């Protein structure tokens, strides 16, 4: 799951807003509804796993939460002769599931049910070329983020074994 597939801009204009503001930290789509409810003065629904981004919008020093991403295979059949990607890459995307955490500090951990797990420092390696997952220097980071992904899976009743 690469940045190009997950980076989606969200534009919002608030009543009384006189200046533009850009938040470059990753945020999650599941936070949009709680943010809109917060702006309307309504309570967040108990079934919404997301949190309001209003503190982040109003305060430039507020740190965003970790962002969790899920990829579940699309088991549809890809037409033979497709040139979207090499056959091996298409087969991998169709058959594997991934759970990803992107931290506010710029780290990204991808855990998979099949294939290789990955860790990237997006600040130093924005194109995700150097997988640091097996680097002993980053083992505590991998452990901490793995625990957070498992906690997220528990919260969202995600039964995928990683």
Provide a role label for each language-model segment:
Residues 33-37, 41, 54, 120, ...:
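Non-transmembrane alpha-helical segments in soluble domains
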Residues 29, 33, 116-119, 129, ...:
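Internal amphipathic alpha-helical segments of the cytochrome P450 catalytic fold
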Residues 3, 69-134, 162:
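C-terminal, low-complexity/hydrophilic appendages and adjacent surface loops
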């Amino acid at each position: 799951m690469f940045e190009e597939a997950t980076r989606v801009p969200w534009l919002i204009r608030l009543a009384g807003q006189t200046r533009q503001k850009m938040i470059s930290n990753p945020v999650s789509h599941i936070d949009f509804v709680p943010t809109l409810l917060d702006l309307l003065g309504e309570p967040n629904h108990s079934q919404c796993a997301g949190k309001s981004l209003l503190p982040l919008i109003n305060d430039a020093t507020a740190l965003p939460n970790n962002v969790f991403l899920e990829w579940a295979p699309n088991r549809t059949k890809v037409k033979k002769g497709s040139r979207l990607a090499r056959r091996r890459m298409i087969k991998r995307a169709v058959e594997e599931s991934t759970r990803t955490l992107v931290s506010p500090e710029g780290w990204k951990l991808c855990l998979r049910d099949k294939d290789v797990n990955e860790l990237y420092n997006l600040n130093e390696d924005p194109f995700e070329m150097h997988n640091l997952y097996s680097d002993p220097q980053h083992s505590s980071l991998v452990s901490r983020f793995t625990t957070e992904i498992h906690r997220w899976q528990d919260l969202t009743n995600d039964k995928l074994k990683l």
